[in-house]
Amino acid sequence: MTRREVLTLVPALGLAGCGYSLAGRGSFLPAYMQTIGIPIFGNTTPYQTVELLFTEKVRIEFQSRGQYTVIPVDTGVDGVVRGTISGISAAPVGFTDAQLARRFRFSIVVGVAFEDVKQQKRLWENPALNFADEYELASPSSIGLDASAFLGQERAAMDRMSSDFARTVVSAIMEAF
């Protein structure tokens, strides 16, 4: 074997045994954990139906991992994810020359926990996950805020945040961080 082959082979062998894996794809969950219940999250804010979007995104993210059956109830399951949306805010962060709001920061606070039903013990919890996204109005009018533009961009920001939230929560649960 040449020196070049040895220098190539040694690092490759070292990496083979290092336990490297993609972040967000590990699982510390017990082998018996096959069915995950994810009932609709609570919502203590005046924003109606936002809990449906966030709950659905968490369900989809768990299902995308491929090894769990996800159901919308907390009975007859091995583990359960519960959450409560406790705060939502939208605030202007950018303005036009006429001092009209052009860019908004939308944020949401969600408390979420994962419980092992069989062992009756909480495996992971974060009482105040905070997610934020900024969005710009496509064309603010010269007389003020265009409500339809605002609501359309708000929905898009909410959709992005709910996807980020779901990935973060499921990865944290799977890896117990």
Please name every model-derived segment.
Residues 2-9, 14, 18-60, 67-72, ...:
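A structural "domain/chain start" motif
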Residues 15, 55, 99-102, 147, ...:
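Intrinsically disordered, low-complexity segments enriched in polar/charged residues with Gly/Pro
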Residues 74-83:
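Short beta-edge strand/loop motif at the mouth of beta-sheet-based domains
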Residues 27, 33-34, 38, 75, ...:
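Short capping/connector residues at structural and topological boundaries
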Residues 150-162:
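Individual transmembrane alpha-helices with interfacial aromatic-anchor signatures
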Residues 29-31, 76, 99-105, 160, ...:
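Short coil/turn motifs at beta-sheet boundaries
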Residues 65-68, 82-153:
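Surface-exposed short loop/turn segments
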